Amino acid sequence: MALELPLDDPDVKAGKPFHGPNVWPRNPPQFRKTLEEYYQALLLLGEQICRCFALDLGLDENYFVDKHSKPLAQLRLLHYPELDMSRHPDQQGAGAHTDYGSVAILTQDSIGGLEIKTREGQWIPIEPTDGAFVCNVGHIMEIWTNGLYPATWHRVANHGRDRYSQVLF
């Protein structure tokens, strides 16, 4: 899901990609409300993180806020299906990549699998922690900070079990 915009919004009327209303299932009845509330909470968390980046850079705390007035941020509910490790020993749940936005905020289930690449080039697992978020710097923040905050290279390892996560990109 993404920012819910009405059909009469100027960006929707102009036909801008990724702008408009979301498509929602009818059931379960509280699904939409729950996801919309979670999405808004994650947007606020992302805004606070961006304020911290700005303050760390010696800028006004609102420096990055106006760049998120109509965010293209997407909340994705991800499922990485179980793979037969004997047949697919090197198969990744998601290959190495960086995210495009300013900051990605995610939770992962107890299975784990998220790995980040250190500056030295080693892959290290991010252990799941109940009630905690993982925040990865995105590519646009790397550009905005002239590389001071590099985008986080990460991947999802296959542990041979179903894995679930929720990510705001």
Where are these regions (language model features)?
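Peripheral, non-catalytic segments flanking oxidoreductase cores
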Residues: 1-169
